[in-house]
Amino acid sequence: EEFHLDNVAGYPNCTFNVSVTYNECTDGGGITEINVGNFSLVTYVCPQYTIDLQNAINAGGIVLDNFVFGFEKKLYEAFEFHYFNLNPSTCLTGVQRNFNWYLDACKQYCITSVDIEGTNILIFNPARCGTGCCKRDTRMCKDPITGQINKTTTYYIISTANCGTILPDWGRRKCDYVTNSCTLPCPHAST
């Protein structure tokens, strides 16, 4: 399913279209689990993002790595808030939405220039470059009194990461740029 995100942190007045596979399961107690599968940026309309990404590409190395991984996290957060706000749940006893993201523990990114209706945009796609996986777990509900959204995100190591042990398979993609290192995308993960 495609979602149009206009709430990405740092990019007001921009729209990012993401393709997401997910399933939703609600238990009898009011908890809804959203298990997110494939997640990718498809297109966007955002001149500032193009400038920021090009600046990161020009700087290269750790600057590019940090930008791409940081932006991916912003997309995850924007999707969580967007999806939650389609049907918000209040923080009554046990009522909440849980977003579960199972991520490759080691990723590297291929950045490709794509022509969309005469406009050249840069899209990044991940590839595994090691073994192991981790989980991003976000729990959300809306406080019925304040109207504020209560949100906690935790990262867990599911299996130990061994980065750099697999060469990334870019498939048929032509990579204009590649992130510098094979990196663990789950910061501050705990077991």
Task: Report the location of each language-model feature.
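Short N-terminal edge-element motif at the start of the domain
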Residues: 1-43, 51
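A eukaryote-biased signal for long
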Residues: 73-191
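Generic recognition of cysteine residues
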Residues: 14, 25, 46, 110, ...
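Structured domain cores in non-transmembrane regions
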Residues: 28-102
